[in-house]
Structures are given as C-alpha cells and as structure tokens.
Design a protein with these regions (language model features):
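Surface-exposed, beta-sheet-biased, low-hydrophobicity segments with strongly acidic/polar composition
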Residues: 3-234
Length: 234
C-alpha cells in the first residue's frame, strides 16, 4: 500500500524428524517484530544533473531512510492525482501551460482555435500572461489550470496545452510561434482512474490512454510527446 512495513511475525516449531535424533525443546515459538527504518541523519548528494544538462532530473528524497528517486524532468507533461479526488497538474518544471477551449468534442478543437487562443506560450514575464494558465504556485490542488475532473464526462472540456519558450523551444525555424505544435487534451473519469484523449491541435482523431491511480505515488505522469506514463511523484 506504499507505507513503510510494520508489524510482527510468529514462528512455531510443530515437528522435527525423530529419525534424525532431533527433539523439540521448551522454546517452541519465536516472535519477530519489525518497524520502519528511521534515518539518524547524514548527507545525500541529489542526482539532478546527468552530465548532459544541468537540470535533467526531478529528485524526491525519503528522509526516513536517506534514499532518493530520480525522474527525468521532461518525461511528463501532465500529472494525474492518485488521491481520492480527480485532479490534474501541469509539469511546471517542463514549463507546461494550458487554457480551456470550452469545447467537448475532439475534432471540434482545431488549429484555428489555437490561433485565436491567448498566447499561453508567451512566457510568465509577458504582460499578457495569466495565472489561470498555470497551477497554483503553492501547490493548492483546488487551484489548478484543469480544475476538478467532473463526474459527468460531458462537463469536461478540452484544454489547449503548450510549453513556454525554452522548454524545447516550440517555434518555427524563423523563430516565429508555431501553434500547430500545441496539444489539445480532454480528461474524464474512468472508474477509479482517468481516461485521456489528446493530440496535436490539428489532429482529427485522438490518441487515448487510460491511467490508473497508484496508491504508492501522489501522481502518475503522462508525456503528450511520447504517450508514455511515468510514476511522476513519490
């Protein structure tokens, strides 16, 4: 269940081979108790740099046992909450931003919608940038760009998602903005998990993926670029 093990195991000797000359003594039972390993302190070097780039990994540290987990920073765009609620977060470390399209049909969201949308990829320092395009900077899950994923699938609209300059520089060769590289994404509930349909804004047929909640993690991530899932946050 993702929690540190704690409890006890009882061992009891029921019989021995008399033909071998063994006999059960007065001590027939033994109790083995165990509890989580607690760190007494120390030093830990965070492996955020893989040598190729300075900020390659997101690193999570378990202070109880001096261990760390590295996750490739660019391995996911969206994170799906594994708690009781149905929430989606943006990977701010990969400069992912999103804005609602107000449309529920995949094919209805087109490149024209992206062209008419606010320039969400303008950058946080732009005068036109809106805090509504990113998640709450203090981590409040009730204040995310996607909002709560509604139980009624028809109430969930497509989000137009992009990345800020420098994430992977989503531009044309002449350095002008290329909104055809933006994505459209719709997330609905799928039992106790999620169903995601997504694609480039010009696509007419969506790619779909189902994401199950994993109680060991806070979030399961999805890369819009590769379609791969990743355990995004321990």
């Amino acid at each position: 269940d993702g929690k540190s093990p704690e409890g006890n195991v009882k061992f009891r000797i029921l019989s021995l081979s008399l033909s071998e000359g063994y006999k059960i003594g007065t001590l027939q039972e033994m109790n083995l108790s165990f509890s989580p390993i607690v760190s007494t302190g120390g030093k830990l070097t965070l492996e955020g740099n893989d040598g190729a780039e300075k900020y390659a990994n997101m690193v999570y540290v378990d202070l109880s046992n001096n261990s760390q987990i590295q996750i490739k920073r660019k391995s996911w765009n969206l994170g799906f909450y594994c708690g009781d609620e149905f929430r989606v977060i943006l990977n701010s470390s990969y400069a992912t931003v999103a804005v609602a399209s107000e449309k529920t049909d995949f094919a209805a969201v087109t490149l024209e919608d992206a062209q008419k949308a606010p320039n969400i990829a303008a950058g946080a320092m732009s005068e036109d940038f809106s805090a509504d395009w990113i998640d709450d900077v203090e981590g409040d899950l009730t204040k995310t760009a996607f909002g709560m994923i509604a139980e009624n699938a028809a109430e969930n609209v497509h989000q137009v998602a992009a990345q800020l300059p420098g994430a992977d520089n989503k531009t044309n060769t002449d350095e002008t903005e290329n909104r055809s590289l933006w994505y459209k994404v719709k997330v609905t509930r799928n039992g106790e998990g999620y169903r995601v349909e997504y694609g480039k804004v010009g696509d007419t047929t969506p790619k779909t993926v189902e994401i199950a909640k994993n109680p060991i993690y806070n979030f399961v991530g999805l890369s819009l670029e590769s379609g791969e899932k990743v355990d995004a946050q321990a």
